[in-house]
Amino acid sequence: MLWAMQQATNSVVEALYNDPYYLGTPTIATDSMQWYHPFKIITWFMYYHQANYLFTSAIMWIGFGLFLIFIIALLLKPKALLTSHGSARWADYKDLLKMNLISSSGVTIGLYDSSFKRGLTKQLRRLEVKKNEKVAYAEMEFDEKQDKVLDRIPEKINTWLEEYNANTDPKRRKELAIKIKQAQAYLKNPPKFDIKKYRWTPTYFYDYFYKLAVKLYKKLPHFYLRDNSNKHLAVVAPTRSGKGVGLIIPTLLGSWKSSVIVNDIKSENWGVTAGYRKKMGHVAIKFEPTSDDGSSARWNPLDEIPIGTPMEVSMAQNLASIIADYEGKGKPDHWTANATNVIMTVLLHLKYAHYTDPENYPTPPTLYSVAAFLKSSIVIEQDKDGVYRQSAKGFVEAAKNLVMYEHVPPEGIDIVEWNTKACSYETRHFTQADLRAIYPNSTSLNSMPGTHPIIYQAFVEITSKPDNELGSIVSTANTALKEYLDPLLASNTSVSDFCIDDLMNYKKPVSLYLVTPPSDLLRLAPIFRLFFEMMVRHHARSIGTYVNGQAKSNYKHKCLFLMDEFSSLGNLQSFAATLSYIAGYGMKVFLINQGLPQINGIYGKDNQILMNCHLKIFYAPNDNDTAQYAETELGKTTIETKSKSRNAGRLIGYTNTSTSQMARSLMTGDELKRMEDQEVIIASGSPPVLTDKIKYYENNYYLEKLINAPIVSDVIRTDPVRNANAKREALLSKQAAQSSSDTFTYDNNIKK
């Protein structure tokens, strides 16, 4: 329009022959040129009635400008969205901003590059496919030739052996011996395929250019989507689909800056990311219950029970209920509920007895000592019908002897406990008066002031049960505790090098890796379920304080639960039920599963796990249930279709074209299965995102952060007596010796 007004102004100037008398002072004037600004025509229009013929061309130019604006507006007008059968669409950049996925930190969930970089990525993938094709054919050709050579060599060896005799010329005998030796060596260790031997062939050039392209591609900066909200995430991705290299490792390599708990099967994530997280200033802890080399930290669940405080019973009940429900059903039956009571009673008794009678209870109680206490109390007896049954007579006798056990003597006991703020062990004197203050309404304390009232009542209840029933109850408790009789597991749960409170309240953020060998996955699932359950119950007790009507959190650091292979932990029914509220307590859950059948098989089809996750990420599924679920979540869009019909008359036929609208899934289940290097992100209340997968090994941004993992786990509790670990010290000494031998020292006494 500005151009049209300039032309209109110029037309009036030309009509008046550049006469300043009529036109006024020009905006720019030189010896050879006079220029009036475009909006001058507006001032001159006040003389239209005196000389309208001067403005004929100007009006035409202005009209032409308005016409151009109208045409451009029509061309640039966005096409109206078709919504009659569905309004689903893919998210754009504005949607990502509203979804708060443009963040400098958080959980890394996808790659969102420009169109140009996406094109480069596609070309790199095509080159990779072509390279793999060429190398595969070359390797097949090599194997075919190799097989023929290997088939001929034994025949040649036999021929040479027949020729190798006393009548053969010595020079020839020497040649034959060398050939036979070389042939036998070839058979013993045949050469392997080597791409370098294919120089100046298309195969070698494809391989060379692919490696060169990857090297250049790694230097490109990329844009990553990150979720730093307080809402949960769920990933549904089949095995070997790239969730580790695309989600877990990028998140741990600096993206998530607060505390994190990683369910780390095979210790891969520890090996790749622990070094960098330690460099970030985190305390990098590895808890591997089956470790025997001293590299793992240790954790005793019984240390989480603060005896001599009002919290002791609730914490003991929580711990006992989780242990007794070793299958994670979340709905205890009669035997499980009573086994919970037995376990709670025994562990509370052992906790107090360690301080009351250190001669008979010399070591702090552990799950091993609880299991051993119960195991030694079961005997097998033959009833009157000749059937052998489990009897708890030994346990009944022990319980009867302990009913009136004095847990707090008149002089009191000195309880040793860890002070998380001072980071040291402290001794607290506990007396019978303190016990009375905790249980002011207990009548048993009137006659037995040193006997713990809860333990007393529990032992009385236990001893009053019939032998057969009690035998089954104790047997249920033993079944729940049987894994802790393993010497390795007992050793790694004998003392605590860290505690649950440290994860969110230590002075530094903590990165905890729960390492499980695949061979022990099912066996160790109960202790990891125990850890997660206790973590939630401990930190979800109080949401914080309120200042000026706003909540102020109690924790120092948020904590991410990065639960890779979530289903491998077994049934976490009670944990799954907490997903609806624990986000408000600073805990963010990142669940990773292989497919919906895996979740439904454990929690049932009516589970609410995915419903409680704000963000859901889908890789190409390999089962129909997941594909159908994702298709439904994406929704329907409206498309326009055209149909043609031809009416063939006698002389002249004609074609009739009709347009109609119909519903279509934004992406069908079949299309989801063929996504290859793409992923779908579905967020509540926002359009879904179709984006690319991350491969951290293709970007120097992540490769430069790869640092060797620590040789041993960090520990928070470092008391030289209570937390002594000879194997750990041996590993550290060995590392120190290697470091000193590798260090350059200048000796001034060395002469030339």
Label each PLM-derived region with a short phrase.
Residues 50-81:
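Transmembrane alpha-helical segments in integral membrane proteins
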Residues 92, 366, 668:
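Residue-level signal for threonine
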